[in-house]
């Protein structure tokens, strides 16, 4: 999967948005919840390869690291809850999309009142 294909997919997720949050770095892209701005992923260029950090359940982190060479410990994130996935690896596009949706669900705001107030403020 290419960076462009991946960002197109992320842009199609209802309630998702993305931006480049770091000054002077126009390649790193934060994948966010539109209402809370909370990250569900971080897309980066690392050693000339596109990677994305995604949140999973701890048991899923271990599982996916075991079955795919393209899934490793998270780069600059909590290694118990986050993975790094290489977009150009042995991980099929459908699996990348599924893992992205899982991360999106796991990082949703759990406080519905706060989310509602944030939406009203927008």
Residue spans for each PLM region:
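Charge-dense, helix-prone N-terminal extensions
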Residues: 1-122
């Amino acid at each position: 999967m290419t960076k462009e294909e991946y960002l197109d997919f992320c842009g199609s997720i209802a309630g998702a948005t993305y931006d480049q949050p770091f000054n002077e770095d126009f390649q790193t892209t934060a994948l966010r919840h539109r209402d809370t701005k909370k990250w569900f992923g971080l897309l980066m260029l690392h050693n000339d390869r596109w990677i994305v950090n995604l949140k999973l359940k701890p048991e899923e982190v271990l599982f996916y690291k075991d079955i795919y060479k393209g899934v490793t410990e998270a780069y600059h994130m909590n290694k118990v809850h986050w993975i790094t996935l290489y977009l150009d690896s042995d991980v099929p596009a459908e699996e990348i999309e599924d893992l992205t949706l899982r991360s999106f669900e796991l990082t949703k705001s759990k406080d519905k009142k706060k989310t509602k107030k944030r939406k009203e403020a927008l």
